[in-house]
Amino acid sequence: MKTVDKSYMKELQTNHIHHNLSVAQLVEKILYRQEGILTSTGAVRATTGTYTGRSPEDKFTVKDEVSDQHVNWGKVNKPIQEEVFNQLLSKVISYLNEKQEIFKFQGFAGSDHTYRLPIQVINEYAWHNLFSRQLFITPTEEELNNHQAEFTVISAPGFKADPAIDGTNSETFILISFKKRIVLIGGTEYAGEIKKSIFSVMNYLLPQQDVLSMHCSANVGQEGDVALFFGLSGTGKTTLSADPYRKLIGDDEHGWSPNGVFNIEGGCYAKCINLSEEKEPQIYNAIRYGTVLENVILNDNSREPDYDDTSLTENTRAAYPLENIDNIINPSVAGHPNTIIFLTADASGTLPPISKLTKEQAMYHFLSGYTSKLAGTERGVTEPLATFSACFGSPFLPLAPSKYAEMLGKKIDMFDTNVFLINTGWTGGSYGVGDRIKLSFTRAMVHSALEGELNSIETITDEIFGLQIPAHVPGVPDELLVPKQTWGNKEAYMKEAQTLALKFHENFKKFTLASETIKQAGPLYKG
């Protein structure tokens, strides 16, 4: 077990700490303290004020002798001095000592007992403590009796920093010290910071134990075959991994160890925008007693959630334990992945709907982490924006992206994993001209990939991107598979495809540590 310096805990008065309250006790506290309100579903709803999403500009990592040589310092991992951290920690503890009551949750991150991290979360707010209880792994009574936290999250949303004095970017701060093994959060009520800070911690610790930490969803078939789904927001990751014929391992964060795949979390933090029972029954029916709804608008009288109302934010969320879903595997551990699917929603309409990747191409596209974001303006003019996020989770990676890519490459080799790139975006033209690829076709492609039907099928090489396109996929029209054939204007297609290829090359320049074979696995067209 890791020896952790917890001298700071001596300064935190304990007579006002509620330890490991039950869901019922926390719901009671939330309502009594007027932190949230009860909804018709039985869930509690809380709002987060100014911050309705993460604050990446306010996230810093302490640069010291422990982190200095390991962390990939830069825009994502901004350094902060140890002295700045220590002073803020002292101030936050003094602030919490003045509170009438605070809340502590003890649990784990990581479903595989070999690699799990014992954690504790100390919260100013009861609703944040319920959120932590639902998102992380709750210990048994025996585990709780022997629990020794190896990482602590301290969350004090009511404490606002003074940048001029405290050395922060703003009144909000998310600070990680790998030496003290503390995450310090202040000035933001957005609960996602608690979840994602522990994910960042696991992305630092797990690779040191030969475990690849991944921002992906995962499910397992009836024969024990495991699939991973990587993809940025809006690519269909949640929709496609929720499959009635396969059991869910988890929806967001996983580790791939020498034993297989395991969920890092014990719950889900699902998007609620436009949620309906018809479209996403699994999520819709999981929202019940004990669930935390974040920034969801309610009907004043009935207290029914209105998932279509985005007046507070489009980033409305529900936090609930995995047990709220019927179709799960418990515990959340499974074997090695047979299939990996990278999802992209390409608005240029030039990437193939499905292609089979070599190991080198898999590492290239993993590092690229490409999708399109659709930026809307008030006049309704939308200009798609090519977005690249390394390893499909750049904001949460303390180490160099190439470290995770190398681990992925080794594991693909070791376990002979098939990797596919599936485009859930546009066909027959770019956004505004073409059409979104039908979900039924995408599901057919995913099904064929998972069933092994495409492993030895004849392929066509894409002339721009160098990708291997299956000549036939059951349930999908053959002409849809080759993007150029779906465009009326072939010249316009070539121009659009070449533009995207150059964006890939431009983005990849930053990966100076990548090997030459990986660099060569990008688009064939180089301008």
Swiss-Prot record:
Pathway: Carbohydrate biosynthesis; gluconeogenesis. ATP binds at residues 196, 215, 231-239, 280, 317, 436-437, 442. Mn(2+) binds at residues 196, 215, 252. GO terms for molecular function: ATP binding; metal ion binding; phosphoenolpyruvate carboxykinase (ATP) activity. Keywords: ATP-binding, Cytoplasm, Decarboxylase, Gluconeogenesis, Lyase, Manganese, Metal-binding, Nucleotide-binding. It is found in: Cytoplasm. Its cofactor is Mn(2+). It catalyses: oxaloacetate + ATP = phosphoenolpyruvate + ADP + CO2. Gene3D superfamilies: 3.90.228.20, Phosphoenolpyruvate Carboxykinase, domain 1, Phosphoenolpyruvate Carboxykinase, domain 2. The keyword Manganese applies. It holds the Pfam family PEPCK_ATP. Its EC number is 4.1.1.49. It comes from the Bacteria. Binds 1 Mn(2+) ion per subunit. It is an enzyme of class 4 (lyase). Its main location: cytoplasm. Substrate binds at residues 54, 190, 196, 317. Involved in the gluconeogenesis. Catalyzes the conversion of oxaloacetate (OAA) to phosphoenolpyruvate (PEP) through direct phosphoryl transfer between the nucleoside triphosphate and OAA. This is Phosphoenolpyruvate carboxykinase (ATP). It comes from Oceanobacillus iheyensis (strain DSM 14371 / CIP 107618 / JCM 11309 / KCTC 3954 / HTE831). The gene is pckA.
